[in-house]
Amino acid sequence: MRRKDSYEYRCQCFRYLLSKDILPSSEEVNDWAVPWLVFCHYAPYDFMLREPGSPKYGIPIPMFNLVYHDCLVIPWMMEKLPEEDYMLYALLNGGAPYLIRDPAYLGIDGAFTLEEEMPWEKHLERVRIVSDFHENVGDAELVKHEILDDKGFRQRSTFANGYAVEVDLQTGSYSISKE
């Protein structure tokens, strides 16, 4: 079997699931399968898979979502670490939040034990913020992304329906607007 045949057979499986009102997903997204997927399990930035505080290679930007944002639902990690708030990346990407992320293995693939757990009510508040924003932009194309300072701490994403979010990764702040 050729690779192309494998892709075609897997897409047939996804189409079959859709025909039975079953939502196909993939652990991670492959561009050849996007037309048939409804969601994936995650698509984090590279640095999110390594231990907190590990160096970043370049400035993380929502490149994948600039192409595929309005095609499928991508859930985002919501951890708030001393050095990074992942909720800001969820907003910047217009993604859905993870309510609970139960990793198979601790210490790898973005699953690291936090010294201080966030109170459940605070976590729910953050999840609601991202959920509400995703409800507004989930079907809208991500049309523009801007880096607003030299270090890439301040970034803005703009969606086709006029919503925009600006984040400051250094201060942990964000603002949502609608034009």
Describe the predicted segments one by one.
Residues R2-E179:
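Active-site-proximal substrate-binding groove within the catalytic cores of carbohydrate-active enzymes
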